[in-house]
Curated annotation (Swiss-Prot):
Keywords: Cell inner membrane, Cell membrane, Membrane. NCBIfam families: PRK04968.1. Interacts with the SecY protein in vivo. May bind preferentially to an uncomplexed state of SecY, thus functioning either as a chelating agent for excess SecY in the cell or as a regulatory factor that negatively controls the translocase function. Belongs to the Syd family. It comes from the Bacteria. Pfam families: Syd. This is Protein Syd. It comes from Alteromonas mediterranea (strain DSM 17117 / CIP 110805 / LMG 28347 / Deep ecotype). GO terms for cellular component: cytoplasmic side of plasma membrane. The keyword Membrane applies. The gene is syd. Its main location: membrane. The lineage of its organism: Bacteria, Pseudomonadati, Pseudomonadota, Gammaproteobacteria, Alteromonadales. It is found in: Cell inner membrane.
Amino acid sequence: MALTISAQLDKFVSSYVEHAKGEGLKIAFDSEWPSPCYEETAKDGELVEWAPKRQSPPLSFNNVEDALSLKLHADYCCYFTTYYSDNLKAKAPQGDCELLQVFNREDFERLQQNLIGHLLMKQRLNQAPTLFFGLTDEEDFILTVINETGEVALEQVGQAPTQILANSLAEFIEQLSPLNA
């Protein structure tokens, strides 16, 4: 039986953290960008250990859905409302990618603003709504969820999706291997 997006995300995050064992996950500390992910405090710019942390309570896309009169795909919402985390680098069958994540509440608000801009652009171009969640190693290509179907697609910014990569976000994440920087 296929895992849900929540279970698949848990599995990938666990393997990501496990893959970093030894050297650990490091990030430059920023006192003006607080996050539950920081394992310690330090002077701004110093490297500190971090780890993905479960959101409690989970964040919500209700304001985006209300503003655009559009129901966002449930898997997409779950993907961004499960963990606080730095972006997660991964290897997919098609190449390297970076899974976008939210580091704190302010980062989530920025994601929502960018998503609204993306959806309004899609509307202006008379294209079906897609929801971005990742970057690729090819400039101008992003990973998106097709809102209507939940399929994961490769999309050039400003264009309709060109290639279906997986039937669902959970199926896509299942194919990934962690790449810790």
